[in-house]
Amino acid sequence: MSLAPHGGVLVNRVNEAYDFQHIAHEIELDVMAFSDLELIGIGAYSPLQGFMTEKDYLSVFENMRLSSGEVWTLPITLPVDEQKALSLKAGDTVRLTYNGETYGVIEIEDIYTPDKKTEAVNIYKTDELEHPGVKKLFDRGSVYVGGPITLIKRSVKQFPAHTFEPLETRKKFAELGWKTIVGFQTRNPVHRAHEYIQKTALETVDGLFLNPLVGETKSDDIPADVRMESYQVLLDGYYPKDRVFLGVFPAAMRYAGPKEAIFHALVRKNYGCTHFIVGRDHAGVGDYYGTYEAQELFDQFAPEEIGITPLKFEHSFYCNVCGSMATAKTCPHGKEHHVILSGTKVRAMLRSGEFPPSTFSRPEVIQTLIKGLAAGVS
């Protein structure tokens, strides 16, 4: 049986019959706000009812909680530029557009100017513009607009066969008879290390929800459609079909490390997962976060506050002496016997058509990735 959503109720802010024709004011959304609008509307970000007011925004900073008390670690905000902010006021109802088309409305409760340097250091642990999350933060508008939203129109889906809302995943898990479901978040192809921890987790639960992020990522990440092909190849060849469910997570990647790990877990709870895999440097980038810092942040909260059970895994690798996948917990041999490649190194190999060793990744997966990247699919 799926867990109760975060906050106890699955939010539904969808009203496709909403009459917005009389509303003159509009805010044009960027890619991140566009995906956030829909994810709020369909309940993936429950208990959020809209973009954060200053009260919730500050509470997330100070307490890693919403002002109502629920654990929440990332600000979900609607930035506008100063010129646009001058034309808005609390009490206004404003259309939310993307590429000129109306997808929702916001009832403005609050308009406020954040201290972005403080936000960067609090959320990303740095204010360096080399960090992709920090750069994105400073590239966005300097004023935030808060208030409840109504989702009037859903976006056109890049992967319609693999796009499911929380109500749908919960129904699917029930139909499959799964009482315990482990969620796995990734923005990367699934190599043997991921396969190992997924299958280790699968030994202890009824089903695996493979939930790759397909929203906005940094420019050198593998494109989502190439990754999706590689996931399908792997699942078709190496996973039991009745124990795995593939569905995409259409959010933007924040690269906020530990705080994003908590956020990712809470969202998967809303999708119906009971467990969530937290590996090494979850949602990390570069060397900004400690290897197991994300796992440690879960320990700052009582289990019932998070509600979903984190499954913490050590860094896994192939050991040439053991002749199998292992971690430091199970392998006594030195690093010289371990097959470990960085994500940066693997991406460079793939783009040059070079095959990483089969002990690192399934050959069929590598073939799919190289072919997709060579075709320039994005």
Swiss-Prot record:
Keywords associated with the record: ATP-binding, Nucleotide-binding, Nucleotidyltransferase, Transferase
PANTHER family: PTHR43509, SULFATE ADENYLYLTRANSFERASE
Protein's recorded name: Sulfate adenylyltransferase
Gene transcribed to yield this protein: sat
InterPro entries: ATP-Sase_PUA-like_dom (IPR025980), PUA-like_sf (IPR015947), Rossmann-like_a/b/a_fold (IPR014729), SO4_adenylyltransferase_pro (IPR020792), Sulfurylase_cat_dom (IPR024951), Sulphate_adenylyltransferase (IPR002650)
EC number: 2.7.7.4
Entry-linked Gene3D superfamilies: HUPs (3.40.50.620), Sulfate adenylyltransferase (3.10.400.10)
GO BP term (any one): hydrogen sulfide biosynthetic process
Domain of life of the organism encoding this protein: Bacteria
Protein family (similarity comment): Belongs to the sulfate adenylyltransferase family.
Taxonomic lineage from the root: Bacteria, Bacillati, Bacillota, Bacilli, Bacillales
HAMAP family given in the database record: Sulf_adenylyltr
Enzyme class of the recorded protein, top EC level: transferase
A GO molecular-function annotation: sulfate adenylyltransferase (ATP) activity
Pathway: Sulfur metabolism; hydrogen sulfide biosynthesis; sulfite from sulfate: step 1/3
Reactions catalysed: sulfate + ATP + H(+) = adenosine 5'-phosphosulfate + diphosphate
Organism: Bacillus licheniformis (strain ATCC 14580 / DSM 13 / JCM 2505 / CCUG 7422 / NBRC 12200 / NCIMB 9375 / NCTC 10341 / NRRL NRS-1264 / Gibson 46)
